[in-house]
């Protein structure tokens, strides 16, 4: 299994530099790839803040990517839930990941962030 960094994923998704897109596609499509949540967070940040990609488009692009059989992440269900929160709520992606863990894996999350606390499941 190979790990890719944010630059590989960005070139693959954006297809803004043909030569790098082709090389990224060869890596992503040609072997088993693991994408850590830290890399996903960087991809989300760059797409939103530097490229101005709408949140829903980010969600759809990453869902398409992680739906590939050869792509693994820390926890697909948590990431999918995080992407839903990120696309619908005015929260940053790391908070969306915390909500994913809270809603999917029932992990208790502690925060001083009032907005985040309103979205947490409490048992």
Predicted regions and their residues:
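Acidic, PIN/NYN-like endoribonuclease modules and their adjacent C-terminal/linker elements
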Residues: 1, 99-123
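Short, well-structured N-terminal submotif of metal-dependent ribonuclease cores
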Residues: 1-35, 50-60, 114
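Alpha-helix capping/helix-boundary segments
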Residues: 8, 39, 78, 98, ...
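A general alpha-helix detector
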Residues: 9, 42-46, 61-64, 81
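Residues that scaffold the ATP/ADP-binding catalytic core of kinase and kinase-like folds
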Residues: 11-13, 46, 119
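Short active-site oxyanion
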Residues: 30-32, 70, 104-108
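Acidic catalytic patch
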Residues: 37, 60-87
């Amino acid at each position: 299994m190979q790990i890719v960094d944010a630059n590989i994923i960005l070139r693959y998704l954006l297809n803004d530099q043909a030569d790098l897109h082709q090389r990224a596609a060869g890596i992503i499509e040609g072997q088993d790839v693991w994408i850590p949540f830290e890399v996903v967070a960087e991809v989300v940040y760059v797409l939103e803040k530097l490229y101005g990609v709408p949140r829903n488009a980010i969600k759809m692009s990453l869902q398409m990517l992680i739906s590939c059989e050869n792509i693994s992440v820390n926890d697909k269900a948590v990431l999918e839930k995080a992407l839903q929160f990120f696309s619908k709520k005015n929260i940053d992606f790391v908070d969306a990941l915390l909500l994913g863990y809270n809603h999917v894996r029932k992990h208790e999350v502690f925060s001083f962030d009032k907005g985040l606390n309103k979205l947490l499941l409490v048992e």
